[in-house]
Amino acid sequence: MFIKKFCKTLLKVFAIAFFAQAAYAEVTLKLGTTGRLGMPIGDAIDQALIPALAKASGGKMKVEPHYQKSLCAEQKCGEQANQGLIALWTSSTANYGNFGPELAIFDLPFIFKSLEDAKRISDEWLAERQCKLALENAGHICLSVYSSGGFRQLGNATKPVRVPNDMKGLKWRTTKSPVEFMLVKNWGATPTPYDWSQLYSGLQSGVVEGQYVASPWQHVAKLHEVAKYFTEIGGMWSGNILAMDAKQYNALSAQEKKWLHTAADAYGEKVNELDNAWIKNGEDAIKASAKEWYVPTEAEMSKWRAGAIGAWLDAKGTFEPEVAKRVLLEQGMDGFVAQLEKAGAL
């Protein structure tokens, strides 16, 4: 009788332990993204985030990806994460602005001088600092900040553009972004909101004459077939994030958080590697068919940056001036700091 009772008790203990372990092994983080396989974000999820989390956790955690807006896109993904429908999501830093201003600093025009500077400063301190604020204030934590397409570059179908004065009178396609609209206007062109899907035909027909789009996307859309003059001014960095709902993040154990951050770091490195290759391939193809790909001198760049001061003034209150100043000074952009301070933007 005693042996039978002991065996039953032992079986119960084993059963409880087994099901507890099984439950622990089934921590699945559902991810919503606009990224797709064959592009840097989708490929980095597939090649780095998923396997890195599985390896770090020994199979106790996994990512369930839903690519190409199959569940949601950017802001909507963030809302679904808040509702507990998904855990992880990707977004541009600009669209994160619907949840709070913590990442607005990444979208300031000319905040970064180069892709290398953007990665270095983000990796060393800026991303961690701003993401901590996001976790505290906005209901989300960004696990990785990275580029998706690098910088926007000017392309037009009419003539060489080397300084802002060369844009005068040209009809320049813009998105609905007030920052982009202001930049184009301050540079002297006529801002013309125009749908992305119609941009190729718009440039071809002359309805619009120029555009300001990240170079690999110009290549994807084959805009270099109808716009032959390019100006490498940079300016607007295409910041993106991998984020998680704060409540779900805080519910993870310390060990689970460690596993997740290990995987997010691997994802950040991979997406940066893939993005750099995507940018280079796109720009190489554009340069091969362009009539001119012009790189302005530093004196000319100061004129392009001057056109961004109004956007910085409009953005006051969404970023910490001392933090922005530190970012600029770490890149040797003392002249731009002086321009911004003189205008009262810093």
Annotate each PLM feature.
Residues 1, 25-26:
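Absolute protein N-terminus
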Residues 2-14:
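Bacterial N-terminal signal peptides that target proteins for export
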Residues 18-25:
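Sec/Tat signal peptide C-region and signal peptidase I cleavage site
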Residues 26-118, 126, 133-346:
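N-terminal secretory/targeting leader peptides
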